[in-house]
């Protein structure tokens, strides 16, 4: 069985959301506004992978990713 550290998993989730945001031609500001997540939270997530479950689900609801 392959184990992935939680930090690596979080960073991969952040990469997926970022890629989907770019595919949708959304800026960070645009995604933050549409999702109701603060811009600083989104930036931190894309850089470090750190985010609350609630904020992650909000981003996911917009990106479908």
Please name every model-derived segment:
Residues 7, 45-46:
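A generic secondary-structure micro-motif detector
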Residues 48-61:
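Short, basic-rich loop-to-helix N-cap that marks the start of a DNA-contacting helix
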Residues 1-23:
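A short, Lys/Arg-rich alpha-helix, primarily the initiator
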Residues 16, 27, 52-55:
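Residues that mark the N-terminal boundary/hinge immediately upstream of a DNA-recognition element
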Residues 64-65:
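Short C-terminal boundary/hinge segments that cap the last helix of small helical domains
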Residues 23, 34, 48-51:
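Helix-turn-helix/winged-helix DNA-binding modules
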Residues 25-43:
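Short alpha-helical DNA-recognition segment
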């Amino acid at each position: 069985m392959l184990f992935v550290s939680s930090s690596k998993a979080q960073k991969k989730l952040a990469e997926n959301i970022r890629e989907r945001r770019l595919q949708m031609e959304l800026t960070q500001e645009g995604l933050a506004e549409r999702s109701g997540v603060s811009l600083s939270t989104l930036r931190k997530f894309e850089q470090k992978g750190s985010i609350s479950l609630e904020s992650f689900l909000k981003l996911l609801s917009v990106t479908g990713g």
